[in-house]
Amino acid sequence: TVARKITLEWILAHVIEDRDKLEPWVYDLLLLSLYQLAYLDKIPAHAVVNDAVAIAKNRGNKKGAEKLVNAVLRKLSSQPLPDPSQIKRVNKRYSVQYSLPVWLVKKLINQYGEDRALAIFQSLFVRNKASVRVTDASRLKEIAETTGADRSVLSPVGLVKSSGYFAGTDYFKEGLLTIQDETSQL
């Protein structure tokens, strides 16, 4: 949620007139729920709304909190979310699209040019691959095959996966794997 905070706040500003009138926990609940609606496709919208309303009902000391949460999230889930690409000012548009402060957007564009800065902005949302160091090099091949990992091109005892979870494996529990970036293994 933190990585997309500026974007989420911009979207919420389209449906909430005065953020300062909301209790901080209500605003945070709306941010978290909006994140689920916008970026997590495995959770149905109705479930996000129901869960948020239940939290507001249990947490809130006023009746209005649950009604507000319900209304805002139903509105957001029933129509396309606002599109930041329609923002006319370039720095503001990139700020909202990539959830970066305007001052940083300006600085990177001034320093690297718009094309290079845009590549930097886009790289912030590329998911890193998972990498581990195998503590017993004699079992490297076996562990690679079992976990579906590839051998590292940088480290002779490293394994990498584009997605996955090494920490849940028996190898990790037995101490045969250490979560470590490839470059740290050199």
Q: Where are the predicted features?
A:
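Glycine-rich nucleotide cofactor-binding entry segment
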Residues: 79-186
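Accessory substrate-recognition/RNA-binding modules or partner subunits associated with SAM-dependent
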Residues: 2-97
